[in-house]
Curated annotation (Swiss-Prot):
Disulfide bonds join 62-153, 653-678, 807-819. It is found in: Secreted. Residues 198-218, 242-252, 455-467, 478-491 have a biased composition (Basic and acidic residues). Residues 162-291, 377-437, 450-469, 474-504 are annotated as: Disordered. Pfam families: Lectin_C (PF00059). PROSITE patterns: C_TYPE_LECTIN_2. Glycans are attached at residues 22, 91, 222, 258, 279, 352, 559, 765, 831, 857. Residues 265-283, 388-418 have a biased composition (Low complexity). It comes from Caenorhabditis elegans. This is C-type lectin domain-containing protein 161. The keyword Cell inner membrane does not apply. GO terms for molecular function: carbohydrate binding; signaling receptor activity.
């Protein structure tokens, strides 16, 4: 019985005994005995604990002792803690303090931002703050909260005369004694108040009387002044009227004489003007016919010269490939508006050079451009008819030969007319000038006939075309040498190889962006003659938008109106000066970073999880080599920074970091600015191309309005992205992207997520039903992508957000002030309307855009 009672007693009261043995006694510290810097009740005293604990465990332990992890530490307290840690912390180099990002961004546990908040990367999750011992610098770090470290607790102080209740270290100041003043009786107050009011009333009455008297005096003065002024006006008016009558009588006779003289002069002048206008009208009529023929001739010659020069450059020049259609367009405009306009016009106007002025020059050029536009439309319609008709191979060959014959006939006629004009320009006779005019008209008519036969080649045979070409040559030869037979058209190719044509074309290509025309909508026909083939007519118009980024450059479009940004990272070790020259050689400059969007974009370019991730940093254009302040290489100001802790120091050049830097005393060094010696070699360089000034003429990767990114730098894994701001359900979002020959976007890795973050970022926070659709869908049992890609290479889901729905959105900013929901995936109902759609598609191949085709996933019903 005794044993049973003892057993029951032990079973019932053992938990109480264990609790009593393990109960932690509250730590009591007296004011000033431990912490000489104690100025507040929070940090009245502190104690370092050498037992390593995780961040949460250390926080709970301090609370159990009646204190907290060291909170709101200033620089002086930090130094004191670090110095004591050298004495009390044996087996570790750092200790926990009471700050972390468990709630959101790095902040003190009891609220308030940290003074050195730029030290930590905001995207790092589950990090606490730890401080080094003084012997190794006393620096601050962000450390994963699961790591076990010593820690420091702070407590409210207790008085030396402490009783059962704790007393704060700092007492409130005692109130000063105020001597008691006797209150006056109510009767005395009323009497004094009435007396004051009566005095005030009397003063007001006196002031109003004085004001009335002064106003009356002022009115009397004004009346007397007005009377005096009216008398003066009457006197002056009477004097003026008498003078006017006398002067009018004297001038009447002289006016009559002057009128008769002026009428005679006007009659003579009108007669002379009418005579001169009659003479000028006759001259202008002849000049108008002359100008029309000359314009037609110049157009033919310019077209032929460009065709020959294109053929010559294609066959002989090693640098021909670098010239694009825009180059030839600019060259054509320069040739028609420069060489031909000046040389041929001056040759034909030797007898009347006075009319060759800038106004005629511009009018003629505009007429030429209008004619070129009409011919371009004719050739396009002819080309459509030819493509729709089912001609045989023999007919195609016939068209090809007739086209070549027509072109050669035009060339021969033009050059014969030119040589004839040069031989006749030495004579100033009217008869020679009219003969030259007839010759040009005949040559122009022959050339027009040849071109007409070319445009109607689908209804005429080869013999007729050859005959018309021979007729054109015969007309020219008969005027020059009546007894000479026409030359073989094939031999006319080399007759126009003149140095002035070469110089003109080279000058036009060298200055390809400064055209001589003023017409912004210039359309020029450039015909390239190839053996045994139809002439290729290229109708090139000046682009109204900025050119797209060069091939394989990351292209970033923020919206439809802002210009695109073009960046590319080159894995080439070099110092800052070599990096600067390298980017200049690529047609751009070292990259500039001016806002959070660009920071996100470039962090995607530098994102690296490979073995060399710790040394992943690159040169950017920020430097102070030539001045005392920082400025970018493109001469833009430093208006946005994310410096590393302790930076900038004494170095003049800047790198942009990728992942954490090795051998750096702080954590949280991702995607920051760091000042480094300019002569130090960095592993890569980040270049930026300014649109419209790039020298790279490779084919673009994405169409206008799309942004390009490749997580590994290869076109194989590259994608073109575009955000479309239309409120749609998911099924409607599919159709929106399909119209753009794309799919609802796939975001498969951390690099793409960072890049897309910059695209979907907004100026304000939205709810979960106001986000951006992406193409991650739960089709049957598993998730997949609309474009057929499979899998995820990172964990994109938002914490404490649903994942069981079938469709997915990508968040821009925070949802309901949840900082962990920024730039993450959220599972949502497919039938809910979202704010925008993100589309993606493969990049262009050889300049050809991607064409939409259904995948196994995109064809499934949701």
């Amino acid at each position: 019985m005794y044993r049973r009672t003892t057993l029951w007693f032990l079973l019932l009261f053992q938990p109480i005994l264990v609790f009593a043995q393990n109960r932690t006694e509250l730590y009591e510290c007296k004011i000033g005995t431990v912490n000489p810097l104690a100025s507040t009740s929070l940090n009245a005293c502190f104690k370092l604990y050498n037992t390593p604990k995780s961040f949460q465990a250390a926080r709970r332990y301090c609370v159990s002792l009646g204190g907290q992890l060291a909170d709101k530490i200033n620089k002086d307290d930090s130094s004191l803690y670090s110095a004591n840690a050298d004495l009390e912390v044996a087996n570790s180099t750092k200790f926990w303090v009471g700050a972390s990002n468990l709630k959101c961004n790095i902040a003190w546990e009891n609220g308030g931002e940290i003074e050195f908040n730029d030290m930590w990367a905001p995207e790092s999750r589950y990090y606490g703050v730890a401080i080094d011992k003084m012997s190794i610098g006393g620096l601050w770090h962000t450390v994963p909260v699961g790591q076990k470290l010593p820690f420091v607790c702070t407590f409210q102080g207790k008085s030396n005369e402490a009783g059962p209740a704790p007393v704060h270290a700092m007492r409130a100041p005692a109130k000063k004694r105020v001597p008691k003043v006797e209150k006056p009786e109510e009767k005395d107050i009323d009497e004094s108040l009435n007396a004051a009011l009566s005095d005030k009333k009397e003063k007001k009455e006196v002031a109003s009387d004085k004001k009335k008297e002064s106003k009356k005096d002022e009115e009397d003065i004004n009346e007397s002044m007005n009377a005096a002024l009216s008398d003066e006006r009457k006197k002056s008016a009477s004097l003026a009227s008498s003078d006017k009558k006398e002067s009018s009588k004297k001038d009447e006779s002289s006016d009559e004489a002057n009128l008769s003289a002026s009428q005679v002069a006007n009659a003579e002048m009108s007669a002379s003007i009418s005579a001169s206008s009659a003479n000028s009208s006759s001259d202008e009529s002849s000049d108008e016919a002359y100008d029309s023929a000359e314009i037609e001739m110049r157009k033919k010659i310019g077209k032929t010269v460009i065709a020959m020069k294109s053929q010559e450059m294609a066959s002989q020049s090693d640098d021909y490939d670098k010239y694009t259609e825009e180059d030839l367009l600019s060259a054509a405009a320069s040739l028609i508006g420069g060489y031909i306009l000046n040389a041929h016009w001056a040759d034909s106007r030797t007898t009347n050079t006075s009319s060759f002025d800038s106004q005629t020059d511009e009018e003629t050029l505009n007429m030429m451009m209008a004619i070129a536009e009409q011919i371009a439309m004719t050739m396009r319609s002819s080309k459509r008819r030819e493509s729709s008709s089912s001609n045989t191979d023999s007919e195609s060959a016939s068209i090809s030969e007739s086209s070549q014959a027509s072109e050669q006939a035009v060339m021969a006629a033009a050059m014969s007319a030119k040589s004839s004009k040069k031989s006749e320009s030495s004579s100033k006779d009217e008869s020679e000038d009219s003969a030259s005019l007839n010759l040009e008209q005949k040559a122009s008519a022959a050339a027009s006939a040849a071109l007409a036969s070319k445009s109607k080649s689908d209804s005429s045979d080869q013999s007729k075309d050859q005959k018309s070409a021979n007729v054109a040559l015969a007309v020219v030869s008969e005027n020059k040498h009546p007894t000479k037979k026409p030359e073989d058209p094939k031999s006319t190719k080399t007759t126009t190889e003149e140095p002035d044509i070469d110089e003109s074309l080279n000058a036009a290509l060298a200055n390809q962006r400064s055209t001589t025309t003023k017409n912004s909508d210039l359309t020029t026909i450039i015909t390239t003659v190839k053996p045994n083939a139809l002439p290729i007519a290229i109708v090139a118009k000046q682009s109204e938008k900025d050119p797209a980024c060069p091939a394989e450059w990351t292209q970033f479009n923020t919206n439809a109106t802002a210009p695109a940004l073009c960046f590319k990272r080159y894995e080439k070790p070099m110092n800052f000066e070599d990096a600067r020259l390298f980017c200049v050689g690529k047609g751009g400059h070292l990259a500039s970073i001016h806002n959070e969007r660009q920071l996100l974009l470039l962090s995607a370019l530098l994102h690296n999880n490979g073995p060399d991730a710790l040394s992943d940093q690159t040169w950017i254009g920020l430097n102070r080599i030539h001045q005392k302040y920082y400025v970018y290489e493109d001469e833009t100001a430093m208006d946005f920074t994310r410096w590393l802790p302790g930076a900038p120091n004494i170095n003049d050049c800047t790198v942009f970091t990728g992942n954490e830097l090795p051998n750096y005393p702080h954590k949280g060094t991702q995607y920051k600015f760091g000042d480094f010696p300019c002569e130090e070699v960095q592993k890569s360089v980040l270049c930026e191309v300014t649109l419209g000034k790039d020298k790279l003429k490779s084919q673009t990767t994405c169409q206008d309005g799309w942004s390009y990114y490749s997580h590994d730098g290869t076109a194989k894994n590259g994608k073109c992205y575009k955000r479309i701001d239309q409120s749609k359900k998911f099924s409607e979002a599919r159709e929106v992207c399909k119209v753009e020959n794309s799919y609802v976007a796939s975001v498969q890795n951390e690099g793409e997520a960072r890049f897309v973050s910059a695209l979907v970022q907004t100026e304000k926070n939205y709810t979960v039903d106001e986000q951006t659709w992406i193409g991650y869908v739960k089709y049957d049992r598993d998730f997949g992508w609309e474009d057929g890609n499979k899998g995820l290479q990172f964990d994109p889901w938002t914490e404490k957000m649903p994942r069981q729905k079938k469709c997915t959105v990508f968040t821009g900013n925070e949802i309901h002030e949840n900082c962990r929901s920024q730039f993450r995936f959220v599972s949502v109902d497919c039938n809910k309307t979202q704010r925008s759609v993100l589309c993606s598609k493969p990049p262009m191949k050889n300049g050809t855009p991607f064409v939409y085709k259904d995948t196994d996933n995109s064809s499934k019903k949701i």
